[in-house]
Amino acid sequence: MLTEGTYRNLIASYRGKNIVAELTGSLVALWCDDYAAANPTADLVSVDLRESGSTLTYLFDIHLQRTIVAYGVPVFATNPRDSGRMAGHPNSAGQDYHRGHLIAHSIGGGTDINLIPQLGKLNIGHFRILEKRVRELARQGSNCLYFVRPIYSNASQMPAQFEQGVILRPKSLLYAVHQNS
């Protein structure tokens, strides 16, 4: 299992010139290895939305039909969210859960792969603290890498936890883990 210390050690050992651009490969390897250790039948694909104008990439498990991480350089989005499309996305997790965004629309998230069952009080509570910080960084044009990783405890599409992280230049980390139950 990855911890805040794992990320801090990776960041501390980085010796390049552009941590935001160059650390992604190491992070993807860590995320894939961590997920595969608990899900040996995983069939992971990378869904890179940069060609469509987004700055985000998603790792998705085809076998269990779930996103395992969303990451990228956040952008300050000013266009309105397509609430009709979001309303059409299934919400089978119960009344206490929202169709939560891994990456908030206001910082570049917006596709169906980005929606996931998220406890309502988390979605409008503690999860927003780091989202707001990232939105402000995006508004300022700060170059950072933002990631959100749903952590699953079984084969369902319901995450047990969410891990949020922001890697900033030169070598710093903002980090939080949230319970989703």
Predicted segment positions?
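Long, non-catalytic terminal segments
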Residues: 1-51
